[in-house]
Amino acid sequence: MKVHLIRKETIEAYAEKNARSKSSFKVWLTVVKFANWQTPESIKETFGAADLLGNGTNRVVFDIGGNNYRMICKYAFGKNQVHLFVCWIGTHAQYDKLCKHNEQYTVNHY
């Protein structure tokens, strides 16, 4: 199923503010645009370094830019498309701070 990315402008705004990340997020956006996912495991097939968070959250963490950036998204597989909601974007170090408090399961900054 095609991916319906919700909050694409959030990714673009982050990339504009963090110029070093721009090309990496552009590549990620292009891959998602042409992705065809049937199950959560399909996400991992497309992005081998992605982590499905579990705990009933339907969240995935994407490693972007050679693991310099992390993006948490919530996914919902619908009848005809996959809805992907951007929940959080930051550096790997910022992500590690979230994880210390188990906030990766609930954070919603966008």
Segments (PLM) and residue ranges:
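Basic, Lys/Arg-enriched alpha-helical interface segments
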Residues: 1-68, 76-85, 92-110
